[in-house]
Every structure is written in C-alpha cells, then in structure tokens.
Amino acid sequence: MTTQLDLIKSSIKSIPNYPKEGIIFRDITTLLEVPAAFKATIDLIVEQYRDKGITKVLGTESRGFIFGAPVALALGLPFELVRKPKKLPRETISQSYQLEYGQDTLEMHVDAISEGDNVLIIDDLLATGGTVEATVKLVQRLGGTVKHAAFVINLPELGGEKRLNNLGVDCYTLVNFEGH
C-alpha cells in the first residue's frame, strides 16, 4: 500500500542539470498536478501544527505561497507573504541575506506581524536555510517569534535544518532528497 509520503515523493520530478550543470532540480509543479498528493501535503502539514498555538502562517516567495495559503485556511489563521523587494504595496520592512554569490533581500508589510505572534513559516524546499533565517529575523524585528517551519522537501546535506535548529526553529519536512 502506498503511503501519503510515498505518494508525495513520487509526485515530485527530479530534473538533472537544471538550472545549471550538476544541480538536480526538485520540481514541485508535478506534485500540484496530482490532486491526491497536493491534498496529502496540505493535510499532513495541517495535522502537524493544529495544536501548536500558531497565530499566523507566513509563506516565502513564491512557492511557499502555494502551500502556506491552504495550510493557513485549514487552520483558520491569517496568511502573510514574504516577498522580494518592491512586490508589496504598503509600508514594508526588509532583511538582506547572503547567497552563494551575492546578496538578496526579502520584505514583508510592517503590520503583518503583531507583538507576541507565534509564526509558522512554510516553504516548498529547505536547502541552506538562508531564506528562512532572513524571514525569522523579519518576524523577530516586528515582535513575533518563530518556533516552527514546514517544508515539502529537505536537501539534508546542504545544512539548512541544522542552521534553523540553531536559531531555535523546529523543522518539519515531508520528504528528503539526497543530492542537489
């Protein structure tokens, strides 16, 4: 019998040498083409966080929106966006972070988080953890806390889970893929 996790993992295509030589791209768009796999993804994340005292769900640009919004809806919680610069219409707060070659910046609305909010961050994939670390810093600057982050995919050898654990963030991942 196929488990929900088997269904999810088998629905994710691995594309070798994309976007560049030596990279194996994990394509979640194929998971979205299998309604039972997409539903299982949302259901498993919702079940994990139903009784954790979460007050807001954040999705990181852009595939975190795909999974974060339905999770927030199922939990009956507000959903907030973390985006690249100049994509949000109201006043924002920004956080820069280092990439392998350069720097990037994330933004969110200044009124997205209230003092004392217990925030769940959702993204499709955990690699180095840089995006989520920057998101944690944004939340903290606005007075919230992040104890939990959920991912569809983890690439364990890239160290993101350890990096986030060192920040006090517990990571929940549905499937691990070796190789990147």
Swiss-Prot record:
Catalytic activity: AMP + diphosphate = 5-phospho-alpha-D-ribose 1-diphosphate + adenine
Leading EC class: transferase
Top-level taxon of the source organism: Bacteria
Subcellular localization: Cytoplasm
GO BP annotations, alphabetical order: adenine salvage; AMP salvage; purine ribonucleoside salvage
Keyword Glycosyltransferase attached: yes
Predominant location: cytoplasm
Keyword annotations of the record: Cytoplasm, Glycosyltransferase, Purine salvage, Transferase
Pathway linked to the protein: Purine metabolism; AMP biosynthesis via salvage pathway; AMP from adenine: step 1/1
EC number of this enzyme: 2.4.2.7
GO molecular function, one term: adenine phosphoribosyltransferase activity
GO cellular component annotations of the record: cytosol
Subunit description: Homodimer.
NCBIfam families attached to this UniProt entry: apt, PRK02304.1-1, PRK02304.1-3, PRK02304.1-5
Family recorded in the similarity comment: Belongs to the purine/pyrimidine phosphoribosyltransferase family.
Protein's name in the database: Adenine phosphoribosyltransferase
